[in-house]
């Protein structure tokens, strides 16, 4: 059920992260089998069984977001326990508050301070990246770090996303990113089709993280489009969603 290439050895001892793939669930084709999304047309009973199976491995049920490819960041310290916030990122300092991001080609990014006092989760498609969802999430985390009067760094973990040899975009997408930072032009390789480019979403995210002073980044080797163990919207159109989750462990 969990098939992402990252080294979890650098995760703070008081933080847990978890990535799902498409295996080991109850959903039938074309959502087979561990689909966690309720908005893609899958049988809701199957989705609930999948969510229940996932929750059994967690300290609490996750905070599912209504993701809209924007840059809003939800402060999960204020979660009421039942609402579905409309946002594309979340942060928290609360133990056992499970942050979750759903994806099927977009890049999920999990973030933690080096001592695990503040965590974040980001849904980073190209629209969210371009509108500053990474920067806004880091700023939200830093505001919580400052209130604790301690110097901390932030590290990032990439879940599975579409790879640079599979993610074709148009000139308009390239222009948006290059106008923001001309150095990222190297992350757009001309495609065989005129006016199209193969984009490196991992590289674009690294660029934004580096600009925010974050250089401890793990993951980025997986391709959802090429690896059939992952859901891929671009490959299959009608398909499920995977989850990337992070939480602070409660003190014993």
Predicted regions and their residues:
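Active-site microenvironment for binding and transforming phosphate-containing groups
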Residues: 1-252
């Amino acid at each position: 059920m969990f098939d992402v290439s990252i080294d979890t050895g650098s995760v703070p001892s008081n933080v847990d992260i978890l990535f799902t793939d498409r295996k080991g669930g109850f959903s039938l084709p074309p959502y087979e089998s561990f689909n966690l999304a309720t908005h893609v047309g899958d049988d809701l009973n199957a989705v609930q069984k999948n969510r229940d199976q996932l929750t059994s491995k967690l300290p609490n049920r996750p905070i599912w977001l209504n993701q809209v490819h924007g840059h809003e960041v939800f402060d999960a310290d204020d979660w009421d326990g039942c609402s579905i916030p409309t946002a594309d990122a979340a942060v928290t300092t609360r133990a056992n508050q499970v942050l979750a991001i759903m994806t099927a080609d977009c890049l999920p990014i999990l973030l933690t301070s080096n001592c695990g006092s503040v965590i974040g989760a980001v849904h980073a498609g190209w629209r969210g990246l371009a509108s500053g969802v990474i920067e806004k999430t880091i700023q939200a985390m830093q505001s919580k770090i400052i209130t604790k009067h301690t110097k901390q760094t932030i590290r990032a973990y990439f879940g599975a996303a579409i790879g640079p040899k599979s993610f074709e975009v148009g000139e308009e997408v390239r222009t948006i990113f290059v106008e923001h930072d001309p150095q990222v032009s190297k992350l757009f390789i001309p495609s065989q089709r005129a006016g199209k480019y193969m984009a490196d979403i991992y590289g674009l995210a690294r660029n934004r993280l580096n600009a925010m002073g974050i250089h401890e980044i793990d993951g980025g080797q997986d391709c959802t489009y090429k690896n059939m163990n992952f859901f891929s919207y671009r490959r299959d159109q009608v398909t499920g969603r995977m989850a990337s989750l992070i939480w602070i462990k409660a003190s014993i």
